[in-house]
Curated annotation (Swiss-Prot):
Cofactor(s) in the UniProt record: Mg(2+)
Region of interest (Disordered), residue spans: 1-20
Localization (cell): Cytoplasm
SUPFAM superfamilies, alphabetized: Inorganic pyrophosphatase
InterPro entries: Pyrophosphatase, Pyrophosphatase_sf
Main location: cytoplasm
Protein name in UniProt: Soluble inorganic pyrophosphatase 5
Pfam families in alphabetical order: Pyrophosphatase
Length: 216
């Protein structure tokens, strides 16, 4: 010990008022009063909806990780890693304060130059609709562009995109679940009109859901 004297540690005095253990129910009730926001329910859809609207990004462009919203906590969670070698061709997320028949917010594929971190939100414009059937259930996707991206903000119709871009999008959704033995069918892309109608319908469904919740 290099000649140093080893001191014997003195016994610590017991605290007169020990810290109580946190009760999980109390902690949960406190969290409901916190400033943390739920991206589905607390984020506004935007004054320009259903044409221009906010989108919460769940999955970044180029990612092989399938993130999704955890509806209970509002956090973005890892659902799975894609079973195939494909990656998401564009940023993918949902429109806040919308609701579809599958009890999820409406899905959006946002075309823009750069990948966006999961959990961020951006402004987008609907330019088309991709009708899709996932394992026998309707699962349509809104095709949109980021209105704050100078390369894409002028696009208002899906027909303005290169045909190859649309082929890439279609092929991704046709193939990304094949190795899971899950069947996905993608129909022909539709114009902005049906996309805007689908968003408005999902906004109306969400409003009905909120009213029903408040009445209970």
């Amino acid at each position: 010990m290099n000649g140093e004297e080893v001191k014997t540690s003195q016994p610590q005095k017991k605290l007169q008022n020990p810290t109580p253990r946190l009760n999980e129910r109390i902690l949960s009730s406190l969290s409901k009063r916190s400033v943390a926001a739920h991206p589905w329910h607390d984020l506004e859809i935007g004054p320009g909806a259903p044409v221009i609207f906010n989108v919460v990004i769940e999955i970044s462009k180029g990612s092989k990780v399938k993130y999704e919203l955890d509806k209970k906590t509002g956090l973005i969670k890892v659902d799975r890693i894609l079973y195939s070698s494909v990656v998401y061709p564009h940023n993918y997320g949902f429109v806040p304060r919308t609701l579809c028949e599958d009890n999820d917010p409406i899905d959006v594929l946002v075309i823009m130059q750069e990948p966006v971190l999961p959990g961020c939100f951006l402004r987008a414009r609907a330019i088309g609709l991709m009708p899709m059937i996932d394992q026998g259930e309707k699962d349509d996707k809104i095709i949109a562009v980021c209105v704050d991206d100078p390369e894409y903000k002028h696009i208002t119709n899906i027909n303005e995109l290169p045909p190859h871009r649309l082929s890439e999008i279609r092929r991704f959704f046709e193939d990304y679940k094949k190795n899971e033995n899950k069947e996905v069918a993608v129909n022909d892309f539709l114009q902005p009109g049906p996309a805007i109608e689908a968003i408005q319908y999902s906004m109306d469904l969400y409003a009905e859901y909120i009213l029903h919740t408040l009445r209970r």
